Amino acid sequence: MKFVLQFTPRAGGSGQENLASMKRSVEVFSKWTPSTTMHQFVARIDGQGGFAVGETDDPAALARDCAIFSPYLDCVVHPVIEVQEGVAALTAAVDFNEKH
């Protein structure tokens, strides 16, 4: 399964709490080895998180990786397919709807 992982800092803390959380998330990240194949990590320019593009046959491994960072980051996993596959699926859906 291909996926895009979106991560953002958890909201709600004071400035000092947010700074401590940011520091800890960077420490954890420096010691972490992904359980899934990560093709690309990118950070948002505004410092409010980022995205990872990856692939796995084990969704439970991805869940474990997200759980490691859950005290510091909100993670949203978007399963994705190649755009050509998406276009083929949409074309089949249009054909189905036009026939029925």
What do the predicted segments below correspond to?
Residues 8, 53-55:
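Short hydrophobic/aromatic beta-strand micro-patches
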Residues 49-50, 73:
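A short pocket-lining beta-strand/turn micro-motif at the edge of beta-sheets
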